Amino acid sequence: MRVKPMFGATFTDIAIWIYYPFNGPTKIRFGLLNYQLPHIGEHIGDWKHVTLRVNNFNGELQSIYFSQHKGGTWLDATDLEFQEGNKAAVYASRYGHAFYSKPGLVLDGRDGIGLRNDCEKDDLYLDTGASYTLVATEYLGSANVEPPWLNYRREWGPTVNHILKDEIDEILKVIPKPLRGHFRKFFYKLPREILEEEGPSSIKTKVNWDGDEI
C-alpha cells in the first residue's frame, strides 16, 4: 500500500498494489465468435492496482481508480458496489487482472471486436483491509521505511519471445475469409502489454507512483 497527499493535501490517495505471479493468455471476441489465443498475453508477473481517493475535509471516499490494460478508469463513490458496509468491491478480469467495478463482460474494443475482460462474483475474495503492508508514506519523514524489494528497478519476470506472426496465421485459419483483414488490423492495435511476453516493470518507476493516475 502506498499513501500520498494529492492536490495540496486536499485529498489523500491510497494506492493498493497487488502482484500476480502469472498473467494468462488473451481471449478475444470477434462478433459472435470467441477465440482463445494460445500464448499472446502470457507473461510471468503482473502488477495491478486500485487507488482510493479520500476527501481530507470530511474523511469520505471520493472515488476509486481501477487500473486496466492501458491506463484505467476513475469512478465516483456513488457508482461503486459496497460489501459489508463500507468495503468497495473490485473485480479482476480472468487471466489479465484488469480491474472493474462490477462483474460481467467488458469488451476492450469497438463494433463487437475486442479483448474480452470477464469478471465473476465469487465466495473467494481478497480482503485488502484485513492484511496489508505500508510500503511508501514519504510524508511521514523518517517514519517512512521502504522494504528493499520496492527499489528493485528491473522487470519482475523474464522476457519470452514468441513469433507473433505465426500465432496470428494459426488463428486466421479458423476465421472466415471476409473477416481476416479486420482481425489482423485489430490484432496489431492491442495494448503493448498484451502483445509482449515480458515481466512488468517496478511499480516505483511508473508515472502514477508520484503523480496522478493517467
What are these regions (language model features)?
Residues K4-A15, P21-I214:
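Domain-length functional cores that host ligand/cofactor binding and catalytic or interaction surfaces
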